[in-house]
């Protein structure tokens, strides 16, 4: 969605900033919803094909996310770079920067391909059941071919978002869903003359969908008048290692930060899985609901990155802080709604997922824990987004490491496994880690933004 770069003079500046950020964030939130729906469709198709297929796709998807987090996080630095160039009136520099980001995305896509090729032979050593390994291997071997397309797609997406144009994220997200659902069904079950591929079919459908989305985005950028002046594809340009190195210096810490947070939740799920099927199922329900709630602050944080970066580029430190506070205001409101829904409706929500009384009872309790971390989760992701807009990424990386792996994971494992508190203990660790990250990231933005504001004072 396109939004104005400046606020109307007749409108109070803060209220206008809230509106601008909200309009910018809405397509991003809906884009994340489409991603969640793709995961839902994968599970439905696989689940109806068979328990073994569902288990294979679940394992394969979890392993797919690990190599995805670092490239996606690394490339998101392009959003802040582009937004700052737009704010500074230096849009001529965006085309060359984008072409170097494409080279970087090619390398990151190749690394994804290599990881997904190397992991399947190791599955038996991870304790994966022997009957699941073949299906998970087939899924990973198929989906790996979409790795380069995925990184190209996110490179183009972050360019577009940095230009204050977020509508393609939503449209291509739902477009991908429309491609994946029928294609996954046909290839998984073997319909319309195609062979039945099971879990491999979903991997093939996912890879094809990634390429369709990437090609569609490239055609849009090439043909759109909105981007014509950037001359994105007018000529070939070899890699310039200095420019790529600058992108990595800003982006790689973001990728590691995203991996630290994502890894916390992945390892927590694995540890809870050791406690039993009831505990694992209850945790999966609670974490799925939490992820749905998280889509809103994540989209607002991405919009805040753009707004903060634009203010930095135009040399407006007060506007930079106003953009961040607008993001905080939106997130505090949305998280209050999410927490209230979880507190008041946790039993009803669980009833949608399961009829198993033991699973429902535990999941209902875990949703109360999820309600508790709505505010710290929203604040930490918003603070991280604001810091990305400042291109302040190295210190936040260490703050994330300390919060999630120095505090959250040790405490969760100690309480959940060491003291026998079970999933509740692990979730206390999640709450502590997210709360520590929220406090430290918030203080970091406060410190950095105040320094920039003071430095700009006459």
Curated annotation (Swiss-Prot):
Keyword set, alphabetical order: Antiport, Cell inner membrane, Cell membrane, Ion transport, Membrane, Transmembrane, Transmembrane helix, Transport
GO cellular component assignments: membrane; plasma membrane
Alphabetical list of CDD domains matching this protein: MATE_NorM_like (cd13131)
Protein's membrane topology: Multi-pass membrane protein
InterPro entries recorded: MATE_fam, MATE_MdtK, MdtK-like
Pfam families per record: MatE
Compartmental location: Cell inner membrane
Top-level taxon of origin: Bacteria
Transmembrane segments: 21-43, 58-80, 101-123, 143-160, 167-189, 199-221, 251-273, 288-310, 323-345, 360-382, 395-417, 421-443
Biological process per Gene Ontology, one example term: response to antibiotic
Key word Repressor present: no
Single annotated GO MF: antiporter activity
Entries under PANTHER family matching the protein: FMN_FAD EXPORTER YEEO-RELATED (PTHR43298:SF2), MULTIDRUG RESISTANCE PROTEIN NORM-RELATED (PTHR43298)
Family: Belongs to the multi antimicrobial extrusion (MATE) (TC 2.A.66.1) family.
Function: Multidrug efflux pump.
UniProt cross-references to NCBIfam families, sorted A to Z: matE
Name this polypeptide is given: Probable multidrug resistance protein NorM
Organism listed in the record: Xanthomonas campestris pv. campestris (strain ATCC 33913 / DSM 3586 / NCPPB 528 / LMG 568 / P 25)
Protein's gene: norM
